[in-house]
Amino acid sequence: MSKLYPVGVQNFEGLIHDGYVYVDKTAQIYELFNTNKYYFLSRPRRFGKSLLLSTLEAYAQGKKELFKGLALEKLEKDWTVYPVLHLDLNTQKYDTPESLTNVLEENVQNWEVLYGASSSEIGVARRFQGIIRRACEQTGRRVVILIDEYDKPMLQAIGNEALQNEYRGTLKAFYGALKSMDGCIRFALLTGVTKFGKVSVFSDLNNLRDISMIDQYAEICGISEKEIYTYFEEDIHELAAATGMSYEEACAELKTNYDGYHFTENAIGMYNPFSLLNTFANRRFGSYWFETGTPTYLVELLKLHHYPIEELEHIVTSQPVLDSIDTASTDPIPVIYQSGYLTIKGYNKMFENYTLGFPNREVEQGFFKFLLPNYASVSVSKSPYQIQCFVEEVMAGKVDDFFERLKTMFADIPYELARDREVHYQNILYIIFKLMGFYVQVEYRTNRGRIDLVLQTQDYVYIMEFRLNGSADEALAQIREKGYAAPFAKDSRTVYKIGVNFSDELRNIQEVKVEMGQ
């Protein structure tokens, strides 16, 4: 029988009963459960948070038989059974105040069937408090509380301040029950993609320990390289055979595509479990994580604040910025980081700041592919084909065709989108050349309204200078004066020097001048 991969499987009991492969995280779960009381964990979507909570639920319910052969079987001696209240906010679309209230109401009603209700308790927050108290009194055990995707309503309301404030008030009151019923609670873990700051839903929970950037728990979600070789050695060989690669090439391709998530400055890289398991199950590489959820709200933030896309490549920031999201802020970076599209690439101990970057090729390529139709004049369906054409044209030396196609990318861009013209035109060019860079060599630099670009293929070298509201002749003169072509003086390839002027008035390329030779 072939191995069963738990793609999308979030229930631990079902996973074990049905014989799916399970990467053992139970030693860390034991430590988590027995060293503190209140926790918060932020991780990207599809990273194993729901399975973590389900495993904790089975542990808290004393289901020893499920942990046979796992680390927890030997670590736990008592297997005490606790009452568990498990709230999953990931199942609903949140677009009205009632959306959230209805989900909370449904869960509270289900718990009241188990532990009773009181007519004196008005509102879901008060009823939640009563449920915690009665569960503790009736069982003689303190309660375990697990909340999955606590922030889903807040995330879906980004851009709608009134609705977000409504959700914040509802959730703050609901989660406030954890503090007021402290004596009845054994353990609580809240998970989500993001952590909202300022007037937070957590502001009353000053004893909540955030383990999102703690080395001790950096590997509690996701799959490490060591775990890949422990649990999936045979699968790598089968993947290599199916894709015509050597074992070493398959390992390198897995690392390039799916590794690279760092949640602290010292942590090892973690692989995206959803993409990794899909790759093994399908015996082919793909953009599995990216295709299950597009970052629409992130793109809206970038566009709303006219954010220069190139800056995503070299962000330096501090832990307080990464730790929480202020909905009034114009900085989209905390949301992009916490959502898993950026990760920690380096740490400066002296200044206590972090360098961020894209974790891997799947995320980087997927992100820029998604950006293109949101910035340029091209449909979602035609976007991949346009990049293919750009690449084929530069590989064939078709300079005129390349720039005619480039002009179409700027055509018919609404005035609102192009309001900050310089940033917008730089963003479009950067996205296009970034996507081309996955197939040909591209070096891209910006400086005071100018863009310098060197693009290399097997047969051609293109040295381009882009100007805004200048002239193509000035751009070409800059290439000559700065000696940009000098490194290619002895190169056998055909070298093109190209000056390009972008007109603010036309909102498009106005003029292109081409010169051949070093």
Show which residues each predicted segment covers.
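Conserved catalytic cores of phosphodiester-cleaving nucleases, focusing on short active-site segments
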Residues: 429, 451-468, 482
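Phosphate-binding site recognition
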Residues: 1-421, 436
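Structural motif
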Residues: 144, 460-462, 496
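Active-site metal-binding core of divalent-cation-utilizing nuclease and nuclease-like domains
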Residues: 135-139, 432-458
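Metal-dependent nuclease catalytic cores in nucleic-acid-processing enzymes
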Residues: 174-181, 334-342, 430-434, 478-498
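Domain-level recognition of nuclease-like catalytic cores that cleave nucleotide substrates
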Residues: 487, 491-518
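Mg2+/Mn2+-dependent nuclease catalytic core
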Residues: 164-169, 468-485
